[in-house]
Amino acid sequence: RIFQICELSRVLKENGLGGFHGVSLEEWLCVIFHESGYDSQALNYYNGSSSHGLFQINQPYWCDDXDSESTEPSVNACQIPCSKLLDDDILDDIECAKKIVKEPKGITAWEAWQPFCNSDLDQWKC
C-alpha cells in the first residue's frame, strides 16, 4: 500500500512518533519518503542484506527473515519477522522504528536523513 503524506502523518502522530526522541513528524515523513516512497511493501536488497517496508528496516539486525540466504545470524532486535514489515499494518513498523531511533545513531541510522531531511522541512508539513 502506498500511503498519502497526510494520512501517514496522522497515523505516525496517533502512534507517538511525532517528536519521539526529538525527531519531528516532518523529519519522519521526509525519511520515509526517501527510503520507501511511502510504500509499505517496499523491499530492497543491498550487500547481502534486505530492507523492509516504509522505514526500510534492515535484516539481519532488526528483523528475522527465515527465507533469507544470508549467512549472518539474525539478531532480530525488534523481535519481528521481516514479512510483518511488508504488510499494511504499520503499527509494528512504528514500534521497531522507535527502537532504532533510541540507539546511539538516532535518526542518522536512516541514510536519507543527512542529505535530505535535516534542514528545510516545510514541504513535509500537513
Swiss-Prot record:
Q: Is Disulfide bond included in the keywords of this UniProt record? A: yes
Residues that carry a glycan: 47
What is the protein's major site of localization?
A: secreted
Which parts of the sequence bind Ca(2+)? 84, 87, 89, 92-93
Q: Where is the C-type lysozyme domain?
A: 1-126
Q: Where in the cell is it found?
A: Secreted
Q: Which cysteines are joined by disulfide bonds?
A: 6-126, 30-117, 63-82, 78-96
Q: Which InterPro entries match?
A: Glyco_hydro_22, Glyco_hydro_22_CS, Glyco_hydro_22_lys, Lysozyme-like_dom_sf
Biological process terms from the Gene Ontology for this record are: defense response to Gram-negative bacterium; defense response to Gram-positive bacterium; lactose biosynthetic process
Q: Which CDD domains match?
A: LYZ_LA
For molecular function, the Gene Ontology terms on record are: lysozyme activity; metal ion binding
Quote a single Gene Ontology cellular component term.
Answer: extracellular region
Which SUPFAM superfamilies does the record associate with it? Lysozyme-like
Tissue spec: Mammary gland specific. Secreted in milk.
Q: Name one Pfam family in it.
A: Lys
Report keywords, A-Z. Answer: Calcium, Disulfide bond, Glycoprotein, Lactose biosynthesis, Metal-binding, Milk protein, Secreted
PANTHER family in the cross-refs = ALPHA-LACTALBUMIN, LYSOZYME C
Relate the assembly described in the record. Lactose synthase (LS) is a heterodimer of a catalytic component, beta1,4-galactosyltransferase (beta4Gal-T1) and a regulatory component, alpha-lactalbumin (LA).
Family according to the record: Belongs to the glycosyl hydrolase 22 family.
Q: What does this protein do?
A: Regulatory subunit of lactose synthase, changes the substrate specificity of galactosyltransferase in the mammary gland making glucose a good acceptor substrate for this enzyme. This enables LS to synthesize lactose, the major carbohydrate component of milk. In other tissues, galactosyltransferase transfers galactose onto the N-acetylglucosamine of the oligosaccharide chains in glycoproteins.
Name of the protein described by the UniProt record: Alpha-lactalbumin
Q: Which organism is it from?
A: Ornithorhynchus anatinus (Duckbill platypus)
